[in-house]
Amino acid sequence: MPGTTARRTVICRLDDLNDPDSRGLTLCLDEQLYDVFIVRQGLQVFGYLNSCPHTGGPLDWLPNQFLNLDKSYIQCATHNALFRFNDGHCIAGPCAGDWLTPVPVLVDAGAIVVVHGDFPVAGY
């Protein structure tokens, strides 16, 4: 709706994450639960649903471990698929060419916030 301001939820501070780093969390937005993760790269933050497009399973192999060893890509724990930080595009693995589902996050005055009105799905 034009003129409507989407609600925002602060999920952490930018300084809470190393560069690069990742963090998983469960968000409750409009009474729906979402398993998501965020990735910091420099002053940018990217958010995605924690769901591999190949299997639908979670991407992390341990809590908050979403990145490959040299922290250059998001890596799926199940089949080692690699995804770019900036757009979630899979560049290697069984789901090459597929995309992670983005979660709308931004940095505002040093806080990482998720924007409710732009959330990708109604829940799962």
Map each language-model feature to its residues.
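N-terminal pre-ligand scaffold of iron-sulfur
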Residues: M1-L69, R84-F85, W99-Y124
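Short cysteine clusters
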Residues: C52, C76-H79
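Short cysteine/histidine-rich metal-coordination sites, predominantly Zn2+-binding motifs
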Residues: F66-Q75, C90-D98
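Short beta-strand His + acidic residue motifs that chelate non-heme Fe in jelly-roll/DSBH
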Residues: F83-R84, A92
